[in-house]
Amino acid sequence: MNIKKTLTALLAGTALLTAGCVGGGDSANKMDTPKEGPVELQVSAAASLTDAMKELGAMYEENNKEVHIVYNFGSSGALQQAIENGGAADVFVSAAQKQMNALDEKKLLADGTRVDLLINDVVLITAKDSKLNLPDFKAVLDPQVTHIALGEPKGVPVGQYSEEVFTKLGILDQVKAKAVYGSDVRQVLSWTETGDADCGVVYATDAAVSDKVK
C-alpha cells in the first residue's frame, strides 16, 4: 500500500485530537471496486486511545458492513516513523501535534483535512492499594516516591506532556532522577498498576479504564 496515496490522520493529546486525510489510496480504491467480503481499513492509533478506538470502530462497522477495521496500536512516535517508512495505514491517530506536523511536512497528509476533535488531560496516578498520598504533581517529590513511570518523551506524547507539566512546576530535574520510561502510555499504566512504579503520569482516559489505579 502506498501511504502517500491515502491516509486518514487523527490527532489526540492533552491539547486536542485532530483529524486529517491523505487523498486517494489503496483502501479508497478498494472501496470503489466490487469484491468479496469486507474492505480492510487499517488504523494506526496511539496506545492511549485503544479502548476508545475499539468502541468507535465497533459502532462504525455496525453501520458499515462493507468495512472491517484492523488496528495497530503503539506510541505515536513509532507509528509516525512506520508511516514515513511506508508502513500500511489508512487511518493515523496520534496523541500529539508533533507527529502529525512531521507527516504534514513530508506531504503525507492531504491538504485541508486536519480537524481538531477533542481534548484529553494528563493525570497523576498510583496503584489502588498504594498508601501514598499524592494530591498534586508536586507531591512526586515525596521521599517515599522512588520510581515515577513516564512515557519516553522523544516518541511518546504523554511523556512530552508530562515533561511540560513538571517544567512549569520547576521540578523536572528532580523528577528525571526518579523516572522510569515506558514505550507507550499503556506500559506506564501497567507499571503503576503492578507497583513496579510508585506513581505514573497517564491520560485521564487511561486511568478511567483501569480499576487498579486511583
Task: Identify the role of each PLM range.
Residues 106-113:
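A short, gly/pro- and small-residue-rich
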Residues 15-20:
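C-terminal motif of bacterial Sec signal peptides marking the signal peptidase cleavage site
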